[in-house]
Amino acid sequence: MNDMVNLLDFDAQGLLAYCESLGEKSFRAKQLQRWIHQSGAADFGEMTDLAKSLREKLATRATIQAPAVISDHLSSDGTRKWLVDVGAGNAVETVYIPEETRGTLCVSSQAGCAVNCRFCSTGKQGFSRNLSTGEIVGQLWMAEFAMRKQLGRGPKDDRVITNVVMMGMGEPLLNYDAVVPAMRLMLDDNAYGLSRRRVTLSTSGVVPMMDRLSQDLPVALAVSLHASNDALRDVLVPLNKKYPLAELMAACRRYLEFAPRDFITFEYCMLDGVNDSVEHARELLRVVADVPCKFNLIPFNPFPESGLKRSNNEQIRRFSQVLLDAGIVTTIRKTRGDDIDAACGQLAGEVKDRTRLAERGKFGKTVPIQVIGADSTHRMGSA
């Protein structure tokens, strides 16, 4: 089985090349793609419009293998979280969030994360490896057909998952070569048929890869901002030491020249006494002044030993009002799935930490540190 080719690893061009390598005509690739991604077929015997000789050939050479489900949890609010096996002792989490007019899937791109944002439990487990294209798109494949079964939907019914956010475990732009083909499949009309506006990639700010994505596959972009100045962001998002705010904002402006939406979504985790003052909000307005944007304020979801607390509702309201008064669309994310640890910042999975010390050092250590905000000082506890 280890020598089998996993067809989930192929986007349209890859599947075409594979079919041609088998001596098959090009139209077979589209047939095969529809069976896999639109019908959810995992058995070549089901693919009745393929020649029997091709089905037999595929059965001995290829497989359709999504990550195996280890656990499956349903929240009281309808959120569903899967823990899936990606081998070598690693597992990642995939979360489905139902809403009245859409169904959003939060997909992981790495086993662990080397960026090690201070407020995120994923980074505390270290980094093991990048996921393959098949492991990334396999989360969508698995979730779509699991949800269809749960809701009693057939192959001709509307898709359950209407939006995908690359906001699970990992930094997508540090796994570029696997993430982009996976997103191509999400957009492909012979696969999942999502629009570029309905696929959102969230990044902590890997500037060179943001520029590359703008040329290769400009989907909707969300940027994990979380701080109003470089001194604070260096602590909360250590990648900022490599790509500081001025460079990041310039990259956002360049990206908007090609983006499917005319704004960048900035994500901002609200941390009590750290980044949530009215002064921080005013400083933030100066940082994003030249970037058309909206803000998504995220109440912090505590996890053991984080040393951080969630801002209270009144403080979040005051912070958001500063942004709203400046004409910036600002939303406060409703916490979903927190009873099954599926809320933002809680995805940790099970990771065998193989992070090289040099890799960790690149983004800085987690230590007790005095953080100077816009007009206040706060000492963050050790994580």
From Swiss-Prot:
Its main location: cytoplasm. Its cofactor is [4Fe-4S] cluster. InterPro entries: Aldolase_TIM, Methyltransferase_A, RlmN_N, RNA_MTrfase_RlmN, rRNA_lsu_MTrfase_RlmN/Cfr, rSAM. This is Dual-specificity RNA methyltransferase RlmN. Residues 99-339 form the Radical SAM core domain. It is found in: Cytoplasm. Keywords: 4Fe-4S, Cytoplasm, Disulfide bond, Iron, Iron-sulfur, Metal-binding, Methyltransferase, rRNA processing, S-adenosyl-L-methionine, Transferase, tRNA processing. It comes from Ralstonia nicotianae (strain ATCC BAA-1114 / GMI1000). Its EC number is 2.1.1.192. It comes from the Bacteria.
